[in-house]
């Protein structure tokens, strides 16, 4: 279910403040964040945001097609190792 239009999209205050300061200074720095639930807003376009996936921060360059998606969508948390080749114990 989508978020109500009466409410604004959720963006962590510390991340938004950092992005606004960088936009004023016209600088490009990597912004480190743990807030995977934050929604990408148009002010973030062109910045690189390092999103935590539980183990490390993955750098994500924000483009215009990413607007209205969450930061966590672009930082996968699970690494699929593949199915076991010869697992005869589980068949019994």
Curated annotation (Swiss-Prot):
Q: Report the protein's function.
A: Protein S19 forms a complex with S13 that binds strongly to the 16S ribosomal RNA.
| Keyword Plastid recorded | yes
The GO cellular component terms are: chloroplast; mitochondrial small ribosomal subunit
Answer yes or no on keyword RNA-binding.
yes
Question: Which top-rank group of organisms is this from?
Answer: Eukaryota
Q: According to its UniProt record, which protein family does this protein belong to? A: Belongs to the universal ribosomal protein uS19 family.
Provenance organism: Picea abies
Read off the PANTHER family from this record. Answer: RIBOSOMAL PROTEIN S19P FAMILY MEMBER (PTHR11880), SMALL RIBOSOMAL SUBUNIT PROTEIN US19M (PTHR11880:SF8)
Q: Which UniProt keywords apply?
A: Chloroplast, Plastid, Ribonucleoprotein, Ribosomal protein, RNA-binding, rRNA-binding
| InterPro entries with a match to the protein in the record | Ribosomal_uS19, Ribosomal_uS19_bac-type, Ribosomal_uS19_CS, Ribosomal_uS19_SF
Q: Which GO terms describe its molecular function?
A: rRNA binding; structural constituent of ribosome
User: Gene behind this chain?
Assistant: rps19
Task: Give its localization.
Answer: Plastid, Chloroplast
Chief subcellular location: plastid
Biological process, per Gene Ontology: ribosomal small subunit assembly; translation
NCBIfam families in alphabetical order: rpsS_bact (TIGR01050)
Q: Which HAMAP family match?
A: Ribosomal_uS19
Annotated protein name in UniProt? Small ribosomal subunit protein uS19c
């Amino acid at each position: 279910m989508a978020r109500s239009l009466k409410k604004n999209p959720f963006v962590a205050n510390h991340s938004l403040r950092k992005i606004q300061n960088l936009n004023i200074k016209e600088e490009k720095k990597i912004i480190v964040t743990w807030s995977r639930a934050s929604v990408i807003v148009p002010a973030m376009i062109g910045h690189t945001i390092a999103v935590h996936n539980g183990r490390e921060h993955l750098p994500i360059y924000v483009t215009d097609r990413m607007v209205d998606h969450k930061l966590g969508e672009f930082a996968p948390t699970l690494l699929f190792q593949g199915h076991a080749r010869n697992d005869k114990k589980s068949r019994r």
